[in-house]
Amino acid sequence: MISASTLDFRDALPDRGRLAGLDVGTRTIGVALCDAGWTIASPAETILRAKFSVDAAKLRALVAAQLVKGLVIGLPLNLDGSDSPRTQSVRAFARNVEPFGLPILLWDERWSTQAVTRTLLDADASRARRAELVDKLAAAYILQGAIDAMI
């Protein structure tokens, strides 16, 4: 099930459970995890993109190891809310991971990377450190926004 509705997504998870947030980019996938009670999202890792089969294997392993019950995937909409070329590629990614058998929420990720980058700049993180952290922190930002909307 792929949905943009937090209500539908929440209904698909009656017992809650751990969620994974994904910030899907062209070169990387930022991954974040939250606790089973949907209290707080934490950055987990950054997956360097390869062929989809390789990406899927890494995600499947993470989902199994962390007992993930649902996926929240950031959807990069244009500022006016319309779809962009990246939006279409993220929707295709969601369709490709649908066989995992987990509910999937597509969550508006506008400004997530910019918000995280601003926080890292304010923390005086070096350019290399920002590059290392931005994707998984953006995934945590996306996931936290979704869980805040559901509780």
Curated annotation (Swiss-Prot):
<keyword id="KW-0378">Hydrolase</keyword>
<comment type="function">
    <text>Could be a nuclease involved in processing of the 5'-end of pre-16S rRNA.</text>
</comment>
<dbReference type="InterPro" id="IPR005227">
    <property type="entry name" value="YqgF"/>
</dbReference>
<protein>
    <recommendedName>
        <fullName>Putative pre-16S rRNA nuclease</fullName>
        <ecNumber>3.1.-.-</ecNumber>
    </recommendedName>
</protein>
<keyword id="KW-0963">Cytoplasm</keyword>
<dbReference type="InterPro" id="IPR037027">
    <property type="entry name" value="YqgF/RNaseH-like_dom_sf"/>
</dbReference>
<keyword id="KW-0690">Ribosome biogenesis</keyword>
<keyword id="KW-0540">Nuclease</keyword>
<dbReference type="GO" id="GO:0004518">
    <property type="term" value="F:nuclease activity"/>
</dbReference>
<dbReference type="InterPro" id="IPR006641">
    <property type="entry name" value="YqgF/RNaseH-like_dom"/>
</dbReference>
<dbReference type="InterPro" id="IPR012337">
    <property type="entry name" value="RNaseH-like_sf"/>
</dbReference>
<dbReference type="Pfam" id="PF03652">
    <property type="entry name" value="RuvX"/>
</dbReference>
<dbReference type="GO" id="GO:0005829">
    <property type="term" value="C:cytosol"/>
</dbReference>
<dbReference type="GO" id="GO:0000967">
    <property type="term" value="P:rRNA 5'-end processing"/>
</dbReference>
<comment type="similarity">
    <text>Belongs to the YqgF nuclease family.</text>
</comment>
